[in-house]
Amino acid sequence: MATREALAHVRLRDGVAVIELVGDLNAAAEPALDEAWTAATSERPDAVVLSFENSGYINSTGIALVVGLLASARAHRIPIRAYGLSDHYREIFEITRLADFMAIEDDEDQAIHGAIHGAIHGDAQGAGGDGNG
């Protein structure tokens, strides 16, 4: 299987930093993800949303990188949400309990709305993990 180079683009929407993940999430993705996280959180956003719409394969190291982002978000009390996961990866995030620590939404609008709603109400994770926050 050919791998796609990982890129991560950061943009701000309504006070929420959106990290768009492009390509495969594996060990090679760590520098791009670290750089994106630093850029996204440098100005203390209300929340961070991870977009998986254009991501590809996610291996166990990629899952570990997401866990690292969750740990950093929790340590800095930054709510975090995700959207755009395929059904397969959404199930993996639920089985591994990543979904307990970040809401997984269907689209960007839901993720942004939930992040803002969660941030307004002081929810450190931005949701209770059920995706309906």
Language model segments and positions:
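Non-catalytic signal-transmission and effector/linker regions of two-component phosphorelay proteins
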Residues: 1-12, 116-133
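STAS-typified acidic loop motif
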Residues: 2-35, 52-54
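Exposed boundary/loop context
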Residues: 8, 16, 55, 61, ...
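Compositionally biased, intrinsically disordered low-complexity segments
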Residues: 21, 69-70, 95-98, 115, ...
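Amphipathic alpha-helical interaction surfaces in cytosolic regulatory modules
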Residues: 25-102
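Short acidic-hydrophobic, aromatic-tinged amphipathic segments that line or gate anion-handling sites
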Residues: 102-107, 111
